[in-house]
Amino acid sequence: MAESVVIDKPSRAQGDLLPQPPQLSPEEQQRLEQAVERTHLPGPRPSPSRDAAAIFDAVGPSVPATGEAASPVEKAMGAAPLAPGTFTFLQNVDLGAGAPSGYTSVVGEPSVGNNGTAVFQTGNWYAALSTDAGQTFSFVNPFTTFPSVNGGFCCDQSVLYDQSRDLLFWLMLYLPDDNTNTLRLAIAKGQSALSSGSWYYYDLTPQMVGLPTGRWFDYPHLTLSNNYLYVTANVFTISQPYSWTNTVIMRLPLDTLSAHTALTIDYYVTNDHFNFTATQGATTRIYWGSQSLTSWQIRLYQWDEGSPTVSWTDVTISPYPSSTPSCPGPDGRDWCGRSDDRILGAWVANGIIGFMWNASQGSGYPYPHVRVARINESTKAVIDQPVLWSSQVAWMYPAVGVNGRGHIAGPVFSGGGTSYPTLNVFIWDDLSPDPVTSGWETYGVVTSTNGPTSNKWGDYLAARPQSPNSNTWIGTGYSLQGGGANSNARPRFMWFGRERDNSSPPYGATYQAAGFTIGASGVTTVPVTVTNTGSLTWGANSVFRLSYHWYQGNTLIDFNGQRTN
């Protein structure tokens, strides 16, 4: 049974876009790098009997391997139409000044949300805002936008947009002091508030959900249903060795969040299952999953909107190898070793509940790989268990987003062996081959030039439906360029989908001038018939340009006019 707590109305803060971010001092960079070691903390290890069961398929995998990722099409503005089923990138950009080198990390943890042309993306130590649909980004300082609390800001940010209430959520983790820590939930209501940096925020602590002093939240994430926002987190002791004690999910009503008033939070806390991963795509019921620590099962939780009752079903899955993952690349640097088998991606759509997680090498799999379980929403029976694997490289760190059709796609990394860490995108929709019988449909995005010198990567990526074109997706990722240090990590923003769902089809206009006479007064009216080609809906703060030219004798005269809608 869930419990409830009331917290005060939110505070307000004003952020600024910074074309030149302040440089972090060496001491501050060292503090942040050390702080990363305190996040993504592991839970209890599985029982020996569970580990021993991983020999289940030593004769080899029973599902086909996925080949090398295909090369996607990057759609240029105004380009000729492509076949409707063509996978395309509408945006695929480096964050540039939005993620300066002093603020990036090989443990990238990028998250993203968008409200029309305003795109907000975060990583471990940075935040970035685009007001031109992700073409360019400016830096937002997460250290100074809000007042500091507890041990100061670091790491584990999550971003999510709710189109129904026009709210963009920005969840930030503050490190613990001697007593507790804080998850700060900042909200920008409307595109203009997001673009101008106008935020209000609530602070969440472990003590608000009935936990004692000396506990702190780690690894927080966000998801939505029709009428609620959900925050999940793992709870650890502040004192070393940072032992796991609880896992929590909090339910926050969207109407109250929109009204920015005092807030009633419903919450559910457990001490027998580590790490909750809640489903993207939920409507009137949220689901979340957690791996059993003693058997080959996923505990499938469910919580109906408006109900205080949390219930669950234990779903048996196939065993999988769960030793320490390893996937050294050409330079011997191993980017897989920080990962574990907590569930990373979860979705519900079209009567199917799905979960995705990392598994290690072993039991016939030469490299770490991604496990998937699809469950019938009505019967809670397993439908199938696809595997994303290869005999040449590891596949790791999947994220999943659900589009308006209930189809899934998201970023995922590959690499190891002769390949450096590579960012890819997978898609599984009505046009994809069945991964169970034919392997996964994947597309390469960018390949690193090096492996991480610290032998770290992750800890998660993000995928969301694009707003307002919910049949396409936005997603995050990164690569290493020119070296293996934190400063070489380059985050990316991606907007992708099928050509049939391209919200920016070739558009423009043709102009036909009618006959006219140049008057002696020097003022001439030229009747012009404008015929539109394609269509485009302009949202708030959109920018468009009208240009035309004519000849005055042999001199070409140009005019360009720009307008912000």
Per-segment meaning from a language model:
Residues 500-520:
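Low-complexity, acidic Ser/Thr/Pro/Gly-rich terminal tails and inter-domain linkers that flank the onset
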